[in-house]
């Protein structure tokens, strides 16, 4: 039988602090882009408020191409950082336009030589056929992880139908509460997000749930 040992702080020994120590101050501006920061609701997380912050975009793209989302093999963090820095990726839809810049990417060696570049572009093309829940997971909507995305797409079938769903319809889906429903409705009501979704659809990214799609 294992014992649980709880550590307790009995006292603070200020004299033990190293010389020149400084109290940690939660930043009120983003260290990357300089925009104001704010605390996320119901969490201790601090986030940048700028939609154009490179660090936020990189994090968003990393989530989008990750295993639980679009699962684009070989799309490493180093490539993402460089593609964002060079202006090739400004939102997730730009990922599916990279093939239009194939020659430039090879010439600049951003992804590597011809073989590596083509391999990644092929993986991106293949990802277009993913189950729709993977796309929903990758959009980065707060409180909508992989399991929730599966349940949502199984219920609504298409991204278009989901975008029109009311709060009542959303909360009728198992494990989807008011907070999650509000986040989903907020995402789909944003004009910038609507443009990104239109571009994804035009690029041929699957927006429909598979008939056999089930919740694990």
Enumerate the language-model features and the residues they cover.
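Short, small-residue-biased leader/transition segments that mark boundaries at the very start
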Residues: 1-5
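Accessory alpha-helical DNA-binding modules that contact the DNA backbone or grooves
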Residues: 10-215
